Curated annotation (Swiss-Prot):
Residues 541-671, 721-742 are annotated as: Disordered. One of its GO terms (cellular component) is endoplasmic reticulum membrane. This is cTAGE family member 15. It is found in: Membrane. The keyword Glycoprotein does not apply. Keywords: Coiled coil, Membrane, Transmembrane, Transmembrane helix. The lineage of its organism: Eukaryota, Metazoa, Chordata, Craniata, Vertebrata. Residues 118-269, 339-498 form a coiled coil. The gene is CTAGE15. One of its GO terms (biological process) is protein secretion. Its main location: membrane. It comes from Homo sapiens (Human). PANTHER family: CTAGE FAMILY MEMBER 15-RELATED, MELANOMA INHIBITORY ACTIVITY-RELATED. The chain crosses the membrane at residues 39-59. Residues 572-591, 662-671 have a biased composition (Basic and acidic residues).
């Protein structure tokens, strides 16, 4: 006791030293007290670390306990679902047995129908021979008619050639007439164009003449208006000038009178001048200015008191003479101005007369032009009348020619229409004859095809009957081999029961060894399945509970009453009265001619199985085989399921069964006589076991060998099984789960094969032999 106690002391010392170093490395504010609560700091730290680890361990243990409880609940749920699936599988198997019974009845009916079909085929052959003779006669008659029609066709062809020649001549004449009509039409078009051009020119000329006439009338009216206006203006001016002339003449006369008076006065004054000269010398004293003189004269004239009368008179005369000179000068200026005005008036008068003469000459020229244009207009109108008459005559001539040509063309068209009617009749007759010939040829082809199809259909029926007979023979051989295999199964089950009674606790033995070592030719190598083991296994064992043994033992090893020995009878009962029709294939059978009857060994060898835990790929799904049916409750001993599920109770296999299976068995017994009655609910329920329902395979693992059974015809080894807790026939009780703490390595699963055989099963039954639809022509 000292040695184990001495070993932890250095470790504890090291731990305490490390703790002291850590505490010393802490700052003073972080350091704990030397004696917290009366304990040293090292013990406190150790206690804290130990408490932390204890908490972690407690959490880990609680997590494990909760997880184990959840796992137990999950296993219970899985067990419940597994039991439900097993019950559903049982129902499906019962329905499958009913379908198998119906198929057996259908095969019996088909065998009976074959005989009646042969009689009907013989009668049909006789009727076909009679119809062939009739058709040959009708064929000869049709050939004669074809010869006659060929002669008629030759005659019609000769007539058709003559009509073609006539049509060619008529077409040539029509073309010539069409050319002539085209030339005439072109001439008519040209004449129409010329007429249109003449009409356009005439219209233009008429428009120009109208415009010229309108302009001439407008010019004449404007000329008249201008002439009248100018004449009125000139008349007014002449009247004014005449008035001025009269006034001027009056003024001239008055001026002449004034001049005469002045001249007389001048003469008198000239007579008084010498007298005035003498007096002038006296008056020349004051010669400074004439104005002063006049002022003095005026003053003296005004005063007049101191002067003499003669002087006054002389002065007055001088003054009056000066005034007269001034007035005369002014009158001469006015006279000159009036003379100038009169000369200007004469000039304007002369200009007006000249302008009037020019207007008169223009008027004469315009009148002459108007007369010329009127004469030209008359000439053009005469030309228009002549041209219109000429064109009307040409149009009448062309119209007469066109009417003649149209009448001729109408006659030719009538002739052509008659010829075309004849041609159409001839072509219709040709088409009718051709249609008749084609119809006759089609009838001949139809008759030939009809008889060929009938011959082919009879050949197919014969071939199908031969294949059906061949498949029936093979099914018989399969049934015989299945009977032998069932006997072997009985021996295997007896061995299993004996081993279970002797050693019920041998559960540690591998499950795969039983499925592999119980083959009739020895164990198969790893990764390869032998055809013998496949022949002894049932496809229904995958869906059943693990290690469930079949209560159906047809013709088995001396237990209970066996079924009848007729190999054609698929309904074989065992010691419990349950039906069984497990049909297994012969692995050594030769392949047939058709694809659906090939050897299952060759097909199964080509199959590739995936590793355990993986599903089949889409391209590698195992094919299904038709003509293979299994009973409701047939089970073999070589099946197994994963070891997480419960194994069935073998002690109570002959005892308790669920009420559902008993009721289904009673229904199956009651329906044995009603094989031909279809069940509408079967197709929908059978979809669960269709081609898409494929369980994942398990890898075969070879285990230890089991004890040898020397009683059967083959050397067998059977595994000892421990007695599981009580349960039903199709599974263990839901509350039971196998222990998990077995000593040694985990158990390998049993070697399993696919639930379905390697051949493909079609989704419908094979048609009855001899039933073919009538060929429709």
């Amino acid at each position: 006791m000292e040695e184990p106690g001495a070993t932890p002391q250095p470790y504890l010392g090291l731990v305490l030293e490390e703790l002291r170093r850590v505490v010393a490395a802490l700052p003073e504010s972080m350091r704990p007290d030397e004696n917290p609560y009366g304990f040293p700091s090292e013990l406190v730290v150790c206690a804290a670390v130990i408490g932390f680890f204890v908490v972690l361990l407690f959490l880990w243990r609680s997590f494990r306990s909760v997880r184990s409880r959840l796992y137990v609940g999950r296993e219970q749920k899985l067990g419940a679902t597994l039991s439900g699936l097993i019950e559903e599988k049982c129902k499906l198997l019962e329905k499958f047995s009913l379908i198998q019974k119906e198929y057996e009845g259908y095969e019996v009916e088909s065998s009976l129908e074959d005989a009646s079909f042969e009689k009907a085929a013989a009668e049909e052959a006789r009727s076909l021979e009679a119809t062939c003779e009739k058709l040959n006669r009708s064929n000869s008659e049709l050939e004669d008619e074809i010869l006659c029609l060929e002669k008629d066709l030759k005659e019609e062809k000769s007539k058709h050639s003559q009509q073609d020649e006539l049509m060619a001549d008529i077409s040539k004449s029509i073309q010539s007439l069409e050319d002539e009509s085209k030339s005439l039409k072109s001439q008519i078009a040209e004449a129409k164009i010329i007429c249109k051009t003449f009409k356009m020119s005439e219209e233009r000329r008429a428009i120009a003449i109208k415009d010229a006439l309108n302009e001439n009338s407008q010019l004449q009216t404007s000329h008249k208006q201008l002439f009248q206006q100018e004449a009125e203006v000139w008349k007014g001016q002449v009247s004014e000038l005449n008035k001025q002339k009269i006034t001027f003449e009056d003024s001239k006369v008055h001026a002449e009178q004034v001049l005469n008076d002045k001249e007389n006065h001048i003469k008198t004054l000239t007579g008084h001048l010498p007298m005035m000269k003498d007096q002038a010398a006296v008056l020349e004293e004051d010669t400074t200015d004439d104005d002063n003189l006049e002022l003095e004269v005026n003053s003296q004239w005004e005063n007049g008191a101191n002067l003499d009368d003669p002087l006054k008179g002389a002065l007055k005369k001088l003054i009056h003479a000066a005034k007269l000179n001034v007035s005369l000068k002014s009158l001469e200026g006015e006279r000159n101005h009036i003379i100038i005005q009169l000369s200007e008036v004469d000039k304007t008068k002369e200009e007006l007369t000249e302008h009037i003469k020019n207007l008169q000459t223009q008027q004469a020229s315009l009148q002459s032009e108007n007369i010329y244009f009127e004469s030209e207009n008359q000439k053009l109108q005469q030309k228009l009348k002549i041209m219109t008459e000429f064109y009307q005559e040409n149009e009448m001539k062309l119209y007469r020619k066109l009417t003649v040509e149209e009448n001729y063309r109408i006659e030719e068209e009538e002739k052509l229409s008659r010829v075309e009617e004849k041609l159409s009749r001839a072509t219709e007759q040709l088409e009718t004859y051709r249609k008749l010939a084609k119809d006759l040829e089609e009838e001949l082809e139809r008759t030939v095809h009809f008889y060929q199809k009938q011959v082919i259909s009879y050949e197919k029926r014969g071939h199908d009957n031969w294949l059906a007979a061949r498949t029936a023979e093979r099914n018989l051989s399969d049934l015989r081999k299945e009977n032998a295999h069932n006997k072997q199964k009985l021996t295997e089950t007896e061995l299993k029961f004996e081993l279970l009674e002797k050693d019920p606790n041998a559960l540690d033995v591998s499950n795969t060894a039983f499925g592999r070592e119980h083959a009739p030719n020895g164990p198969a190598p790893l990764g390869q399945r032998s055809s013998e083991t496949r022949a002894f296994l049932s496809p229904q064992t995958l869906l059943e509970d693990p290690l469930g043994l079949s209560p159906v033992l047809p013709e088995g090893g001396g237990r209970g009453p066996r079924g009848p020995g007729n190999p054609l009878d698929h309904q074989i009962t065992n010691e419990r009265g349950e039906p069984s029709c497990d049909r297994l294939t012969d692995p050594h059978r030769a392949p047939s001619d058709t694809g659906s009857l090939s050897s299952p060994v060759e097909q199964d060898c080509k199959m590739m199985f995936p590793p355990p835990g993986q599903s089949y790929p889409d391209s590698a799904l195992p094919p299904q085989r038709e003509d293979r049916f299994y009973s409701n409750s047939e089970r073999l001993s070589g099946s197994a399921e994963p070891r997480s599920f419960k194994m069935t109770s073998l002690d109570k296999m002959d005892g308790s069964m669920p009420s559902e299976m008993e009721s289904s068995r009673n229904d199956a017994k009651d329906d044995l006589g009603n094989l031909n009655v279809p069940d509408s609910s079967l197709p929908a329920e059978n979809e669960a076991t269709g081609p898409g329902f494929i369980p994942p395979p398990l890898a075969p693992v070879r285990g230890p060998l089991f004890p040898v059974d020397t009683r059967g015809p083959f050397m067998r080894r059977g595994p000892p099984f421990p007695p599981p807790p009580p349960g039903t026939m199709f599974g263990a009780s839901r509350g039971y789960f196998p222990p998990r703490d077995f000593p040694g390595p985990p158990h390998a699963p049993f070697a399993m094969r696919n639930i379905y055989p390697p051949r493909g099963l079609p989704p419908y039954f094979h048609p009855r032999p001899g039933f073919y639809p009538n060929p429709a022509f």
